[in-house]
Amino acid sequence: MSKLIYLDNAATTQVYPEVLQEMLPYFSEVYSNPSAIYSFASESKKAVDKARTSVAELINAKTDEIYFTGGGSESDNWALKATADAYASKGKHIITSTIEHHAILHTCAYLEKKGFEITYVNVDENGKVKLDELEAAIRPDTILISIMTANNEIGTIQPVREIGRIAHEHGVLFHTDAVQAFGHIPIDVDEMNIDMLSASGHKINGPKGIGVMYIRKGVKILSFIHGGAQERKRRAGTLNVPGIV
């Protein structure tokens, strides 16, 4: 077999050996449900709490603003669909860019079928969102701006801080798909004016099937997946402890 030369890390990455070793005990030794109340479950809960704290510290968030999901696409869907549902009484207009990931673009297409209006802002020759066009697109009924932090195909890093500032000056929520940037460039949700952020484990040498959603306190979006009371009643389903750690 010829030696593999892998050049697709923007799509997915190899799980680091040390990550795999950290995961293994939670498959066969500490396999308890972290939501349970017996003592064996406390070990799983401690591992989840530790991981939640690590993620929060990485982006300067509070631990209770971090939610674990099934991946970046789920987080993107949650941000857009739940915001649309929660803030529809204020307006049905959302702004995004023409070069977002399909998890955003296809969700926007879904929302258009539900009666929402989407404005797709253009980018310049370097792939950066045109800030003047973005600000001009804001209307009284705009409820959300969603612009990715870094593009998954051309690598352009967007002026997230400025986009967030513009959003907040107009009383609009700001979500960023940071799947391609999380763990690679510094992210500070306060300094960058971010209300919601999506991230994924398999882009940073972790396993597939685990994602993160940051939701700033005060953002009034509700459950996206219904069922149990996991993730402070906002995201149902038994937690994927091996993936989370």
Question: Can you name each region flagged by the protein language model?
Answer:
Residues 1-245:
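Pyridoxal 5′-phosphate
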